[in-house]
Swiss-Prot record:
Molecular function as annotated in GO: small ribosomal subunit rRNA binding; structural constituent of ribosome
Function: Binds as a heterodimer with protein bS6 to the central domain of the 16S rRNA, where it helps stabilize the platform of the 30S subunit.
Gene: rpsR
Upper classification of the organism: Bacteria, Pseudomonadati, Pseudomonadota, Gammaproteobacteria, Moraxellales
Family of the protein in this entry: Belongs to the bacterial ribosomal protein bS18 family.
GO biological process, one term: translation
Signal sequence interval, chain numbering: none
Record's protein name: Small ribosomal subunit protein bS18
Length: 75
């Protein structure tokens, strides 16, 4: 019987050597927001604690400045 092994998650920011997450980098921040506008937790993305805090702060700043939506499109 074959066992399914889940691929180990890793922090993308540590691997790429990114030291600071900028709130103006909207394309990067969109990858860490769910379809309904919530911040995706680090247990799903594999982001380390340090960068998850920076990510949350950057997303909140971008939302405040209307670069990102608070919620999804209600239709």
């Amino acid at each position: 019987m074959a066992r399914f092994y889940r691929r180990r998650k890793f922090c993308r920011f540590t691997a790429e050597g990114i030291t600071h997450i900028d709130y103006k980098d909207v394309e990067l921040l969109k990858q860490y927001i769910s379809d309904n506008g919530k911040i995706v937790p680090s247990r799903i993305t594999g982001t380390s604690n340090k960068y998850q805090r920076q990510l949350a702060t950057a997303i909140k700043q971008a939302r405040y400045l209307a670069l990102l939506p608070y919620t999804d499109n209600h239709q």
